Amino acid sequence: MTSKPSTSDGRAHSISHVPGTHMRGTSASHSPRPFRPCADCTCSPGLLSRQGRRASLFLRQLENSRRSSSMLLNELKGAGGGSSAGNGSVYSCDSLCAVNREVNTTDRLLKLRQEMKKHDLCCYIVPSCDEHQSEYVSLRDQRRAFISGFSGSAGVACITRDLLNFNDDHPDGKSILSTDGRYFNQARQELDYNWTLLRQNEDPITWQEWCVREALEMAKGLGNKEGMVLKIGIDPKLITFNDYVSFRKMIDTKYDAKGKVELVPVEENLVDSIWPDFETLPERPCNDLLLLKYEFHGEEFKDKKEKLLKKLNDKASSATTGRNTFIVVALDEICWLLNLRGSDIDYNPVFFSYVAINEDETILFTNNPFNDDISEYFKINGIEVRPYEQIWEHLTKITSQASSAEHEFLIPDSASWQMVRCLNTSTNANGAIAKKMTAQNFAIIHSPIDVLKSIKNDIEIKNAHKAQVKDAVCLVQYFAWLEQQLVGREALIDEYRAAEKLTEIRKTQRNFMGNSFETISSTGSNAAIIHYSPPVENSSMIDPTKIYLCDSGSQFLEGTTDITRTIHLTKPTKEEMDNYTLVLKGGLALERLIFPENTPGFNIDAIARQFLWSRGLDYKHGTGHGIGSFLNVHEGPMGVGFRPHLMNFPLRAGNIISNEPGYYKDGEYGIRIESDMLIKKATEKGNFLKFENMTVVPYCRKLINTKLLNEEEKTQINEYHARVWRTIVHFLQPQSISYKWLKRETSPL
């Protein structure tokens, strides 16, 4: 739906729409719709009237709570108490839908463009990642969120400075936010009027192409003066060298703009420069290190190092003698290699560090404190510790070693442009020089640790099963509690409070280290926002007459979990049941699949989508991602999805991946069913692999339309629910609400 621009609507534009129009985001608030009987089902009038009374009661109770909150707010104001939301009680019932979390970015963009002028930039790029190319970043590295207001985990912001505007105090320009299908709805809600949303894989151009086109348009407006070079700037630590080379190639070949447009490094991060003008710049976290015991990791550092060096020697050129230095950049790879964990990034047990490793030495660059036991561990294993910042000096120093005919220097394809620049300090390290270095004793490779880490050993697999059982017990207790509160007691509970309750339950489990990501607790239309997270204040009330989607996970010392269940607490519509069942059928089909070794997840993605496709439906995210072992909840390199890079990484025995098809109806509801699966040898079929569902949480019986299931699927569900019951019942008090809930949900179809 499109509408004319309005000064009262501060939402982002969509790049795919006609100039002069823009798409409005999902409404931030609306009045509850009156109950209407479903139009396409066989419900009896009695059932419908009970559902109607429950909906009406819910709305009356909500209205009473709002009225009480309003009276309390007036009392506070009258007493000079202001409008503090410290307790959240005044605001917790404010809306049935997601609140408008839009940030006004006008002043921030103005300041940024002033900084761009100092560096003679026509365009500036702000990626999501940190210098380790992390998907999830610390507050210190959330530059893209700061400048754009968009809080999703993936996306790139591009800001231009209009060179035809000569008002230095108020420079003008454009700004876009590019993100993928998981975040389209969220971006429309969070971006203000300064921003245009560029939808990856749907809009006709990429963000890189947009930057070059804008630069060329400005050059044209300035008369394409001889010798004029328009500069696109980026922090060289925040873009990989490979991406830099691809960007340069696109400028030079696709647009024939060599000498007209240039991608330049800006070592002073411009967002960091303006951040303190608006709020305190967060400090980089530097928390204590944790040394994992063998009972949790199952493989000593020396054994991992031996495997790594063998892989590196296989990748090195035949001219070297085996003394190949490799720089480990990814934080989870460092944690896995050293059997250490940290807490520098929320939900991810990692710490800021680099590692330089070869046959003779292992150097860990970190500022994180550690105890005497870890100090002794470093000494025993020959691990030298240096300050985090010294990695750049070290890279410059060992360039001379890399020039030796007997030594090859290797960096991962996740290495930053700045890393390559440090390896070649005599020049500016453009693409041509990189090729020359590569032809000598310098190479960019895919990190062998990425694959080694993804193949879990026997101890990690055993522990992963334990983690799944622990989390399943928590989720059973949580869903039983939620139903008792919302249906049994007709209480008002908002999405955020519910998520906090789930965390409280998880904290009762031994070795619980925290959540593996921010809990997605979403009711009704909020569930259609794929990566929704409830706000602390003004969170939506969970409506028991609508779908509720809960996507959550835990970090235990034993392992990492990622589980989604979609439930309905009263009477779902036939459409909701049908679409839930189509999603469920896709997940079941993928789980049953037996496939040849060396099959990439790209090749089997359609298995999970086939039943949705048959109805003209689909979902805009991958079907499965790797899961770490008390590490990142998103782990590569393999996965099941439609992204072309997944064709390069086959699924292997020992991988743990998610299985999470879904369906999302904008403005109404969302469905996702996610379980974690272990890939195993299918010995009865020769060189074939199969999946084992490790998650033991029941599906929602109310949402299953058995008429859409065949006998094989019914048997599969019944056998799964029988296993869930056998596994979990021993952890529950007999005849408790959790016990009764589990018994009902796992009863045969």
From Swiss-Prot:
SUPFAM superfamilies, per the entry: Creatinase/aminopeptidase, Creatinase/prolidase N-terminal domain
Cross-referenced Pfam families: Creatinase_N (PF01321), Creatinase_N_2 (PF16189), Peptidase_M24 (PF00557), Peptidase_M24_C (PF16188)
The enzyme's E.C. designation: 3.4.11.9
Region ranges (Disordered): 1-33
Modified residues (Phosphoserine): 69, 92, 95
Primary subcellular site in the record, as a coarse category: cytoplasm
Record's catalysed reaction(s): Release of any N-terminal amino acid, including proline, that is linked to proline, even from a dipeptide or tripeptide
CC cofactor note: Binds 2 manganese ions per subunit.
Role: Involved in the regulation of the iron regulon in responss to decreased mitochondrial iron-sulfur cluster synthesis.
Other comment: Present with 3237 molecules/cell in log phase SD medium.
Summary of subunit composition and partner proteins: Homodimer. Interacts with FRA2.
Protein's recorded name: Putative Xaa-Pro aminopeptidase FRA1
Organism: Saccharomyces cerevisiae (strain ATCC 204508 / S288c)
Upper classification of the organism: Eukaryota, Fungi, Dikarya, Ascomycota, Saccharomycotina
